[in-house]
Amino acid sequence: GVTVMRTTFIELQTPFMSKIRGRWRAIEPYSEREVLDFPRYGKGGVYWFNTVEALTVADTFPQLKTIITKFGSVPDYYNRLTWLMARLPKAWLKNSALIESLSHISYRMTQVTDPSTGVGIAMRIQIGGQKDGKAATYLATFEHEDTAFCAGCGTGAIAQLILSGQLHKPGVWPVEQALPTSLFEETLAQRQLVIERQE
């Protein structure tokens, strides 16, 4: 809803840090457009965007040299508008009244387009490295017609594992540090969610 829109505009205000070739680098938000293919949605534009995974994945897997977090929307004109917003004077982006107004306008726009474009999600992770001494690439994609359903499944899965006593990790942890892969895959199967993998 409107909170997601506010968060998006807040994230456009300042550069964020990401690990590139083993060094931390400041990245301009919503920059370096790249077109990727998502089977459910076809080709879609994605842009650098600050997500918590830029930090937590680097902490969880320190051997990774480069971590790129990108985001995009369908229809693509939302990407173009967000790109333009990111280029506004920073003082405008830090004007809370303007951000509040734009957040409400943006949310109303999605209410108009969502019936035709849907409210789905597509995620992609690509890992490049070495396997058995040779260059290798691993690609995983996840797509679903309902983003809110998937978010609920994720939250519900963690709650289920804690309440059933299968997950014991006191404190505050990123999911990738708290949840073993075997339990993650088990909860996906229970919810009939599928991650497609290619090696």
Model feature map: region roles:
Residues 1-199:
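C-terminal catalytic/substrate-binding lobe primarily of soluble NAD(P)-dependent oxidoreductases
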